[in-house]
């Protein structure tokens, strides 16, 4: 096996020797080769998507939770917060320190919940898409459609067949729209309007 591109045609991967018998350069090359192999495998892609989805979901959840407090006078007080008297109807009736404590606690919970959901969906979708692509041995838009349908249907199957069908259609449509947008740069360039 020889690496392709970027002038690496002359570089071969290290021989199959025990790791401790390799030179430092060969150890680095072997480590890089192992990382690339992991990152291009289906479990690796699923793990990377899960971690990335968790991080982005946390940021998104934190942002959305912070937007929930844009009108503090009309924000109802949480009913299950410990130490709150029953007569408190709105968050603005509480002392400032308690308001801040409740808001940060709520933002943390919402952020973590959103992070878990995004990570879970990203991991499942990416893993299913990789498996579908491996089974079909093609890289086209239908992999994303099938993965979206299987992911959406799989996530909603506990709610019944109608919900699974709606989840399948919704995820497949969203995946198709994203894939069409991302593959847009592979199209034929537009006609030159100076020739007309």
From Swiss-Prot:
GO terms for cellular component: TIM22 mitochondrial import inner membrane insertion complex. It holds the Pfam family Tim17. One of its GO terms (molecular function) is protein transmembrane transporter activity. Keywords: Disulfide bond, Membrane, Mitochondrion, Mitochondrion inner membrane, Protein transport, Translocation, Transmembrane, Transmembrane helix, Transport. Residues 1-27 are annotated as: Disordered. It is found in: Mitochondrion inner membrane. Belongs to the Tim17/Tim22/Tim23 family. This is Mitochondrial import inner membrane translocase subunit TIM22. The gene is TIM22.
């Amino acid at each position: 096996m020889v690496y392709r591109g970027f002038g690496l045609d002359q570089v071969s991967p290290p021989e199959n020797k025990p790791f401790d018998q390799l030179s430092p350069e060969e150890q680095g090359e072997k480590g890089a080769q192992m990382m690339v192999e992991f990152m291009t495998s289906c479990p690796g892609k699923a793990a990377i998507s899960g971690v990335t989805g968790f991080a982005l979901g946390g940021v998104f959840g934190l942002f959305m939770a912070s937007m929930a407090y844009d009108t503090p006078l009309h924000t109802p007080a949480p009913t299950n917060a410990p130490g709150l008297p029953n007569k408190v109807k709105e968050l603005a009736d509480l002392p400032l320190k308690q308001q801040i404590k409740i808001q940060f606690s709520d933002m943390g919970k919402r952020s973590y919940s959103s992070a878990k959901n995004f990570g879970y969906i990203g991991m499942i979708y990416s893993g299913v898409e990789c498996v579908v692509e491996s089974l079909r041995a093609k890289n086209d838009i239908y992999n994303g459609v099938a993965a979206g349908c299987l992911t959406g249907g799989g996530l909603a199957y506990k709610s019944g067949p109608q919900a699974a069908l709606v989840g399948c259609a919704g995820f497949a449509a969203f995946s198709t729209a994203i894939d069409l947008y991302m593959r847009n740069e592979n199209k034929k360039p537009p006609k030159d309007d100076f020739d007309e």
